[in-house]
Amino acid sequence: MSEIEEYDIKDWVEEASTASNQAFRQAVHTILSAIASDSNLKANMILKGGILLAIRYKSHRYTKDIDFSTERKRGGEITEDGVRESLDSSLVQMVEELDYGLDCLVQSSKLEPSNDPKYTYPSIKMKVGYAYKGTSQHKRLLSLRSPDIISIDYSLNEATPNIEDLKLNLEEGILAYSLTDLIAEKYRSLLQQVSRNRSRRQDVYDLNLLIERFGDINNFERGKILNSLMALLHKKGKEG
């Protein structure tokens, strides 16, 4: 497999083409750093999806969502209230440590589907608002009404066969899907689209980006991709 270029999340933030996009990227940096600085959040929130592709693999197509997975089931340390409280507390600390002057607060959270034991693959959905301190937008943020938000989709009871450490700085990192798991996840998504009679061109674009950039994937890596795909399908099922 081709060697992956080194990356720096601060470079990604500074490469923003507009002021609004830079604020969004600063908020992403703040959220990821907040998760990295909390031992329980870091151990259980595995980054995947478009934001990982953007930061780690230089994709230019992504939404204002951050996707995470964990093999843990609902209950114990993994509850809607527990995750929200831990993230909010860690955000307060990280807002002060980073020099962006940007505040971030969890504005809402919910469990989907509902808090019913029959749903074995729920997600914790959160919306994190952000605004620069000293602005009128910050007043709206403090009342949890910021129009500028980042959605977090935290999937529980998901297979995470191969993970790696995504470095945020010299001291901290966040756990993330490996390249093989990202490719396997995209293939699983395509299989789901057939069964659900839906189409998402974004997944095809992402697969093309990864395969073009790392086209010399050897048989060992192909085997890891297949094993990851089988684990994902076995854990949640093709219809999951």
Question: What is each PLM-predicted segment?
Answer:
Residues 1-240:
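Compositionally biased terminal segments of proteins
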